[in-house]
Design a protein with these regions (language model features):
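Conserved beta-strand-loop surface patch within small alpha/beta domains used
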Residues: 1-78, 86-127
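Conserved, mostly hydrophobic/aromatic
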Residues: 81
């Protein structure tokens, strides 16, 4: 018996508070990258983000941001991550894709305004 994998057309939305928090965090960490865990809910391919978590033991630099995910508590409200790209495009690098966490990865490029937030799936396709 072969199971058919259901394919969702993913959609991402976030509250104004979450958006403002992401942009402020990226601006505060510039010229280094910043990274946050996205908290929210997902249903039928739609991801709704309503909170942010600073990951424990995160490390950032001019061209990297990451955290070990093994010390994270089990929290089903974690739906993905967001990090900044202070220089260059908002497209995910191979390293970004290999460290994908959750359902969505958001990348914010400088100068960190509303139109500078992009969402990606685990295959590197824009959502």
């Amino acid at each position: 018996m072969q199971l058919k994998k259901k394919k969702f057309e993913r959609k991402v939305s976030l509250t104004k508070e979450a958006r403002d928090g992401i942009l402020s965090f990226c601006k505060m960490n510039h010229p280094n990258e910043g990274i946050l865990i996205l908290r929210g809910k997902a249903k039928h391919g739609d991801v709704f983000i309503d909170g942010l978590v600073v990951p424990p033991f995160s490390e950032t630099g001019a061209d990297f941001a990451g955290f070990p995910n093994n010390p994270l508590p089990l929290d089903l409200s974690y739906v993905g991550i967001v990090h900044s790209h202070p220089v260059g495009s908002a497209e995910p690098s191979l390293t970004d894709l290999n460290n994908f966490f959750g359902l969505v990865s958001m990348i914010v490029k400088s100068p960190y305004e509303d139109d500078d937030i992009f969402a990606w799936d685990s295959d590197g396709k824009e959502i």
